[in-house]
Amino acid sequence: MPPAPGTPPPAARGFGPGRGAPPNPATPADPPATEQLIAGGWGYATISPNSIQADNGAGLTAGIIGLVNKGQRRKPDDWGSLRAWAWGASRGLDYLETDKAVDAKKVGIEGVSRYGKAALVTMAYDQRFALVLVGSSGEGGAKLHRRNFGEAVENLTGSGEYHWMAGNFLKYGTAESSFGSKNAGDIPVDAHQLIALCAPRLTSISYGVPERGDAKWLDQQGSYMAAVAAQPVFRLLGAKDLGVSDDYMKEKMPAVNVSMLDGQLACLQELTLFKAPNVNSYKRFAEGSFAPTAVAWGRDNRTCSMR
């Protein structure tokens, strides 16, 4: 993906509020990941999700969802905020396709946590995106709904998160209703199918580690299982998968910083997810210039993490 001299650069788009947190002045720090991307010949743009759709249930009568519904409450099959944010990312790509300074065929999308969910939805619904980096997405993202571990469907359907999903999804978190009790086992699809919709494009499922704050609540193993279950679709479309068996019940997520970056489908668990020390690993994944995965920390980042 690196641009040839005189050609437009690839671009990464990220969901988030804007600039990242400043480095701690008491410790050595690499330049912010966005600065490293730009220095490496990439472009970078940040999407402000709240400018598209508010991150709360009260906002469902406003934003793009409210605009379509003319300020009325949404219908059961209408979007939640995740799909609305993905729609906004696609409209951003519409613009990038008109900008001759950008190679619009090499635009990726990335996000962490709820924005990791949104990045995965964006990639699944818009075939124009060439790359997705899905960070710590958990339930409603890359994690299998049916795996009874950590965050559950009932959390997504609760008061703090229900607006992320379509209204119809809420019935899968009900103990009592006119149609009876439903749970994750009643959902006709699961996360591996969402990941499969990204094939054969570059798809990275990433997590940090509990010791550094990426809680077990996110269920790293559950997302790895979903990626394993998505492998057949990547192979069907001529892409290289994780290189493990399709037995998602047997396969275990690799150890920290033992990353699976050799194919179009990738999984990795890092000490500092999506932070500056790891950005070169993501660049190598996108560029196809894979490197050994031994951990080596270095202040200038050229030898930092998964080098």
Model regions and ranges:
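Alpha-helix capping and helix-loop boundary segments enriched in small/acidic/polar residues
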Residues: 76-84, 109-110, 120, 178-189, ...
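Short, solvent-exposed loop/turn and secondary-structure capping segments
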Residues: 49, 55-60, 121-122, 134-135, ...
